[in-house]
Amino acid sequence: NSEGADTFTFTIAIPSDEVLAEITGRTYDATKKMYIESERVTKYFAVGYILGEKGEGEDERYVWRYKGTFNIPDETSATENDGTDTNNMSLEYTGIYTDHIFTNGAGTGKAGSAKAAFIRESSDIATAEQWFSEVSTPDTTFD
């Protein structure tokens, strides 16, 4: 497939050093309580999220991206003050097609790999709890 990777940016609260090392393929030495910018180990993750704002009149989409890596993030920092500044991190996720061939990856009854899938809340196919209880794929069915 000649289609390229998809890149998405998530703005998140700054994770623990252990989690940051895990998702970026770096090292966290628990004995020394030290994050180490070691050589990266490529690790793939599925990521699920809700797109759209219910209160904004948008039809929320429940999304799963099946295979991707997190890039080393940009961090924002503020000097110490008495204000209410928040510090977040922009984490870039690059999604690619799965190696796995889903039975319904190219539609019902058509095998294929997939990068992602989503359903709209209004479709009544599944609740958010059902959709996110495990990674929902083109082969997932809901009761």
Residue locations for each model-derived region?
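Beta-strand elements of well-folded, non-transmembrane domains
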Residues: 12-16, 51-55, 69-72, 95-99
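Short helix-loop boundary/capping segments
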Residues: 38-78
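Mixed-charge, glycine-accented linear interaction segment located at domain edges/termini
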Residues: 72-143
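Short, solvent-exposed secondary-structure capping/transition elements
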Residues: 18-23, 54-60, 102
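Charged, amphipathic alpha-helical segments
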Residues: 15-38
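Oligomerization/assembly interface segments of phage tail-like spikes and tubes
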Residues: 1-20, 85-98
